[in-house]
Amino acid sequence: KDYGVGISEEDLPRVAEEFYMVDKSRARKQGGAGMGLALCSKIVEMHGSMDDQLIREFSEKLEYLRSLDKRREEIRTLIDGQEKLTDEISLALDNAETLSELEDIYRPYRPKRKTRASVAKEKGLEPLAEIILKQESKCDPVAVAEEYVDEEKDIANVEDALQGAMDIIAERVSDNAEIRKRIRNLANVNGVISSVAVDAEKDSVYRQYYDYKEPVKKIADHRLLAVNRGEKEGFLKVSVEMDTERPLNSIAKVMITNPACACADIVKTACEDAYTRLIFPSIEREIRNDLTENACENSMKVFGLNLRQLLMQPPVKGKTVLGLDPGYRTGCKVAVVDGTGKVLDTAVIYPTHSEAKVKESKQKLLQLIKKHNVDIISIGNGTASKETEMFAADAIKEADHPVYYMVVSEAGASVYSASKLAAKELPQLDLTLRSAVSIARRLQDPLAELVKIEPKAIGVGQYQHDMPQKRLGETLDGVVEGCVNSVGADLNTASPALLSRISGLNSTVCNNIVAYREENGAFTSRAELKKVPKLGPKAFEQCAGFLRVPESKNPLDNKGVHPESYKSAKELLALLDYSDKEIKEGKFTDLANRVAAKGTKSLADTLKIGLPTLDDIVKELSKPGRDPRDELPAPMLRSDILDIKDLKPDMVLKGTVRNVIDFGAFIDIGVHHYGYDSQIV
């Protein structure tokens, strides 16, 4: 089996043990983090280049396999404790590939609450059930059943005896792992998700699902989540439907061994009861749970993609930005920040009020633009955003220098403004003005600003509140950490919120880093990190490669080269004939050509490192302090507004993707209405 990263089934236990991918408690004891650099580098050396998302998926697969093995052994022990474990059962457990298959095997041995079958067994009817199941040609079930009539046991007549026997047979059919597997497969292939209105006269957003059917194997995630929500809110009744003929025939092939026997009809009736009363309701729950779980996983991946796109937007560096937090009644909050994000000025204007107020607001905006030499206006995309955009576009036409504007997502700005972190960062500002500061700063550096907000508060998808919140939180946190680690952080300027997303650092250590910085001045090397209280060797190993120190005398401290690779990096530069002066200045011109001339394989062998590590070192030395966000399309700055009436057939426009969903994307082209594109590869 291949689990996606070239790991064979035989390798899994060793890999899981070596990398602590599965045993989280052990990882915690070792001070390990999911994105630990040592972990990543070892996997990369074994399997080639892997991004953090692939590593995370690999980790999740291994965790599932470990939980599968754990449950397998638990069931084996439980059955053995009942002295019913056979070689056949043990082999079936070994061959089971899913938790559902394991539970099917365990079902007959699971302690049961009182059931119709258990009551019949208490009455002594199990021998009758065994006789009927044998289906011997000469067997007369009625005659045999007469022997079990006993009023003291509440078996008043033959019908009672046969019914009890059928209850026992039905439960046995339901407990048959092979039968359940067949029915499950049939339901997955032929089943249909059906939704009907609880009250067809009552209008709701779910009207399209009031009489709706779609095959289990085809239903899209967003439609499944929609009917689930409609059911939860009381508008829909949802079920799985399937024609009964094929499943009943499938059961009969297993249970009816002698169709000509009089007992066969009784077995057939018991099979029908087992399917209708016991098997299908259980399979229906399983299918809906599996579909929902799968839809949630896929949706969370889409949410993660949306969040990643928000976080990895290219920064607008070194520009003075005026942030506008739009509003109607309470006005539009204004904040001006310099190129470093420092607050220069604040105000409140009323661009959606009376004509006099609009004129006054325009004058105030132009005054702020002139006073602080504003380069760009950042407009939040919430309530009154369109009106504010029109106002700003009109106002900047009268500015004394070129000014551009951009609409940014204001999701989570209000959450940030009311947070303890905002109160600590901006104690002098009113809560409402803090959101304007956030809107300005998230244009300058979206990642640095958005990490201050809980990922779920950023708003990354339509059904995010229907997701398992713990799992969603873990997924989004992983995305944030991946983005921060990908970009890196300046050790001397990064906020505690940004530092806390660096692999290996917790909130206590982050606060200690800031405290050390304030007490001792700027860090002069990565090695100085080791002096920070509570930052141990494991944490240093994991975080050092993601932290930059521009002020260091060692040029490698300002690159994405990990300290454990410094020796290899220096040896590489020596092999490539760079002078001490060039190394000190960090100027490695013609590096790629020199590496090619020597041969990457030869260099890797000489340095005794893997090719992926060598490639990473070369990339980092070639592009000092490279920011992966700079390789993406620059933010779309506008100086004038476009109206939908201005659009003509065959026009080609650039736009900003505002939201990605599993059936398309919504794109802002600046005309007040998002375009929709479903043709996304």
Role assignments for model-derived ranges:
Residues 7-19:
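Short conserved segment of the HATPase_c
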Residues 2:
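Acidic ATP/Mg2+-coordinating residue in the GHKL
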Residues 70, 74-78, 429-433, 437-522, ...:
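Long, highly charged, low-complexity intrinsically disordered interaction regions
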Residues 148, 158, 252-255, 267-271, ...:
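Low-complexity, acidic/Ser/Thr- and charged residue-rich accessory regions of DNA metabolism proteins
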Residues 54-57, 64, 68-323, 327-429, ...:
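Duplex nucleic acid-engaging cores and interfaces of nucleic-acid transaction enzymes
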Residues 36, 40:
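Short alpha-helical Gxxx[C/S/T] motif in the catalytic ATP-binding
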